[in-house]
Curated annotation (Swiss-Prot):
The chain crosses the membrane at residues 417-437, 456-476, 493-513, 514-534, 539-559, 581-601, 663-683, 691-711, 718-738, 758-778, 805-825, 854-874. It comes from the Eukaryota. It is a multi-pass membrane protein. It comes from Saccharomyces cerevisiae (strain ATCC 204508 / S288c) (Baker's yeast). Induction: Expression is constitutive and independent of inorganic phosphate concentration and PHO4 activity. Low-affinity phosphate transporter involved in the control of cellular phosphate levels. This is Low-affinity phosphate transporter PHO90. Residues 1-288 form the SPX domain. The keyword Ribonucleoprotein does not apply. One of its GO terms (biological process) is phosphate ion transport. It holds the Pfam family SPX. One of its GO terms (cellular component) is plasma membrane. The gene is PHO90. Keywords: Membrane, Phosphate transport, Transmembrane, Transmembrane helix, Transport.
Length: 881
């Protein structure tokens, strides 16, 4: 197995970015080899000097560089060399090299001398020597940077785990597992073998209990499911909690030990690779001699001994708390079993992803086969309510003894469906409009809207139902007003569902997937978070900025998931009741909702809205001009709301470290295609003669990423197709209400009611409606239902800018409903976040107390700042489409 794969299999998933970057160092080696090969055959004779005493070079490398930097720029080169030589001889390690300059120093001085005085015939040789030194310096420099990264992370993590260890020891002392008067060092430093002596088990439950019930139940069988009184008293509960703490800390420390071992193996492997490819001798001189690890903490023998000691102590604690202090080996084996189960569970998806086994189920264990069989039986069986008959009914071939009705007919969802069918039937039977098609279309809209609002069936299944109902209800009309035949209506509605909007939606998913999969979004986001510093409110603001920025390009569906993964080092260290943790989780969700208005591809509702804005000449440029200022202001106000309502100032944080990596050719290719696609979308109105629509531009990144193999069929299958289908259902519903004339009729009726009101007042009215529907139903559904209506209302008003302003404003406001845990994808993601104990960070009340005010703040930003900018950038009435 390749070591890069071995590293991924065995690495702790949450620590992936803190291991040595083996693949990057390997790429560096091959790059340096290519540079050497380009020099030609002029390197002959240099090999012996190159491999001589690399240890001296490593010792003097960094002090040489420092001396070089300290040299005044006004000095001549000879003076600089003298100063460097003096400083090198004054180093603490000079006792081993002062008598005779190292080969590295002699070589450097020789090269500097030749730079001044060599003839033209020796220039090539000097360049070759310079290249070899640069090769060594570059490789060891990068190797040292990786070592420092590993060491820094280990020290931080060890300190955190050892604090937990100390707290655990105190708790164990309180319940008597460890005696106060015993010297900890004496107890802890005993070898495990010495603990095999018989020690009486601890009696934590020595209180007498005179309860006659338990006296009577003294002969209860061992296999009873009832809890004994000793199993739910306070001491027993403490004992169970501490046992769990020991297991968790044992797993943490073992993973920390594997972190050291994996990185040490990695450094040995990569130096072996460099020696083989670049003809160096780094493994022997640096790794095997331990010279490379002398300035680290993680790789010292004392560090490993201390870690092993802590692990051994945990085994002893576990043996004592389980009343088996004489059986250390069994306790050790049991803890190893917990470790194994944890690793298998935590990394199963990682392993399956790498082995390509996620979609394969042909190698099942007997237990898995039995489980699947039972699951199939559960699917096939139907549960019934049964009522016995007074007397059996005897038929020719059977007899009926009772009446049975399936339970699924009496569920909450079933009652919702009954209600919707009843109301739809009433609307079909009662005349609501003079026009028959509009009358039936009203019943259709009510049926679909209620199904979406109640979620009696899944949203995307309702979307599938729309084209069928459109044909059955006969609501589509021809250009002369006649009702379409079923065949014509079917072709018309199905053709309308696949539109430019759907292509842009797929392109948005493609860009989001490729940016996330190739680590580009994560790297950029980590650098943004690194600027936040250590103040909780600054970290909160930067986290909100990151998810807002990511939402612009990879949608506000994927952005919060990626941001939470970046924040996991912070969240993992905090409990669910931490105010800062709650503010962080909620802030990301609210910022992602607001980020849903930030760009034309940041959310499904924006993509749908753009199809209504295009006829008014509103493209990407105008969208950004309105959405970005409104969104940024709303995000800042929500940030102020959060840090004033959550008491987070007492939280102490470590500075977030950015992910330092060099982008590869593939990553630059992805960035180039992404930026080019966005630019084409921005200037789409100017190049409409070439592409025709934004949907055609959307094909470009799809082809360039899937066609080149950067994304696979599995990635395409993983797209959130339910959202795509929901958008298609919305398009079909919009086509139906438009073709039937229902929207026009409603718009005329509303026009008479509000024709004397200004555009601003109308925007406020419909904006409140958008907030309510978006909060209680769905952001996307609110856009699907209301935006076509406001477009018709706006077109009927006298102001030529009314329609684009109303559509634009409602499109932005559709993202502002965030008062409930179910209001939008970001909120659903946030409410599902739990800490390491399995407790939720947020509650429904948290969303109500912060989400509702946040919705109002965002609403005010759109109808004030957003309205002012919209009034200046929109052009007026729709152009001919």
């Amino acid at each position: 197995m390749r070591f890069s794969h071995f590293l991924k299999y065995n690495a702790v998933p949450e620590w992936q970015n803190h291991y040595m970057d083996y693949s990057e160092l390997k790429n560096l080696i091959y790059t340096l080899q290519t540079d050497e090969l380009q020099v030609g055959d002029n390197e002959e004779g240099f090999g012996a000097g190159k491999s001589s005493n690399i240890t001296d070079r490593f010792k003097n490398k960094f002090s040489f560089k420092n001396a070089k930097e300290d040299t005044s720029s006004g000095m001549n080169k000879d003076a600089g060399i003298v100063e460097e030589t003096i400083e090198l001889r004054e180093l603490p390690t000079a006792q081993t090299v002062a008598a005779k300059p190292s080969p590295f120093r002699r070589m450097k001085e020789k090269i500097f001398y030749k730079r001044r005085s060599s003839s033209a015939s020796s220039v090539s040789s000097t360049a070759n020597e310079n290249l070899q030194l640069d090769t060594y310096d570059t490789f060891v420099g990068d190797l040292t940077a990786e070592k420092q990264k590993v060491d820094d992370f280990y020290k931080r993590t060890e300190a955190k785990f050892y604090d937990k260890f100390d707290a655990l020891v105190k708790d164990l002392k309180k319940i008597g597992v460890i005696e106060y008067d015993i010297d900890d060092d004496t107890l802890f430093n005993e070898p495990i073998a010495s603990t095999n002596d018989e020690v009486p088990p601890l009696d934590l439950d020595d209180d007498e209990d005179d309860d006659e019930f338990y006296d009577d139940q003294s002969n209860i069988e061992d296999n009873t499911a009832l809890l004994h009184h000793s199993q739910y008293n306070i001491k027993s509960q403490k004992k169970s909690l501490l046992k769990k703490s020991i297991v968790n800390l044992y797993i943490d420390l073992c993973q920390l030990k594997s972190f050291i071992e994996l990185n040490r193996i990695g450094f040995a492997k990569i130096t072996k690779k460099s020696d083989k490819v670049l003809h160096l001798n780094t493994r022997t001189e640096l790794i095997e001699s331990e010279q490379f690890f002398k300035d680290t903490y993680a790789f010292q023998a004392e560090t490993i001994e201390l870690l092993n000691s802590k692990i051994s102590q945990l085994v002893t604690f576990y043996a004592r708390i389980t009343d088996r202090p004489h059986n250390i080996s069994h306790s050790k084996q049991e803890l190893k079993s917990y470790l194994h189960d944890h690793i298998v569970w935590e990394r199963s998806n990682t392993w399956k992803d790498m082995l390509g086994l996620l979609s394969q189920a042909d190698e099942l264990t007997p237990k898995e086969t039995e489980y699947n069989a039972n699951k199939l039986v559960g699917k096939l069986d139907l549960e019934y309510y049964r009522w016995p008959l007074p007397r059996p009914i005897n038929l020719k071939f059977t007899s009926i003894n009772n009446v049975a009705l399936p339970k699924l007919f009496f569920t909450k969802k079933a009652y919702k469906i009954y209600f919707i069918i009843l109301v739809t039937g009433l609307l079909l039977g009662i005349k609501t409009f003079n026009d028959a098609a509009q009358h039936r279309c009203m019943a259709l809209v009510e049926c679909v809207a209620f199904l979406w609002a109640s979620e009696a069936i899944p949203l995307h299944i309702t979307a599938f139902l729309v084209p069928l109902l459109v044909v059955l209800f006969k609501v589509l009309k021809t250009s002369d007003g006649a009702i379409m035949s079923a065949a014509s209506a079917s072709s018309e509605i199905l053709a309308a569902m696949w539109s430019s909007t759907i292509m842009i939606l797929l392109a948005g998913f493609t860009l989001g997937e490729v940016l996330a999969q190739y680590n580009i979004a994560k790297v950029l986001a980590s650098w943004l978070l690194a600027f936040a510093g250590c103040k909780p409110r600054n970290v909160l603001l930067m986290a909100m900025c990151v998810v807002f920025f990511l939402s612009m390009w990879i949608s506000n569906v994927a952005a919060p998931v990626l941001t939470y993964s970046l924040l996991s080092p912070l969240l993992d260290a905090m409990d669910a009741d931490s105010p800062f943790a709650q503010a962080l989780v909620l802030g990301v969700a609210l910022a992602a909702n607001i980020g849903g208005m930030s760009s034309p591809i940041s959310s499904p509702q924006n993509i749908i809205s753009m199809s209504y804005l295009k006829p008014y000449g509103i493209g990407w440029g105008q969208f950004f001009a309105v959405a970005l200022p409104s969104g940024i202001l709303a995000m800042l106000l929500v940030w102020i709301l959060l840090f004033t309502t959550f008491k987070m100032n007492k939280t102490k944080l470590e500075k977030f470290k950015p992910i330092k990596t060099k982008f590869t050719v593939k990553q630059y290719y992805i960035i180039t295609v992404t930026v080019a696609t966005i630019l084409l979308w921005c200037v789409e109105s100017q190049i409409e003669g070439a592409f025709g629509s934004s949907g055609q531009i959307a094909i470009i990144p799809i082809v360039l990423f899937f066609g080149t193999g950067l994304l696979s069929t599995q990635d395409l299958n993983a797209f959130p197709w339910s959202i795509v289908i929901l958008a298609m259902g919305g398009i079909a519903l919009g086509k139906a209400v438009s073709s039937s004339g229902l929207l026009s009729t409603i718009a005329k009726a509303l026009q008479k009611k509000i024709e004397n009101d200004g555009v601003f007042a109308i925007l406020c009215i419909f904006g409140i409606l958008m907030l309510v529907v978006g909060t209680f139903v769905s952001h996307t559904v609110s856009a699907i239902i209301i935006i076509p209506l406001v477009q018709e209302v706006g077109d009927k008003l006298g102001n030529p800018k009314a329609a684009p302003i109303l559509v634009f404003g409602c499109a932005l406001l559709s993202s502002c409903g965030m008062g409930l845990a179910s209001s939008g994808f970001p909120n659903v993601t946030a409410i599902s976040k739990v800490d390491r104990k399995g407790d939720r960070y947020l509650s429904v009340m948290t969303f109500l107390t912060r989400g509702v005010p946040a919705s109002i703040l965002a609403f005010l930003c759109v109808i004030t700042l957003g309205y002012g900018i919209m009034a200046s950038v929109v052009k007026g009435n729709a152009t001919s489409a």
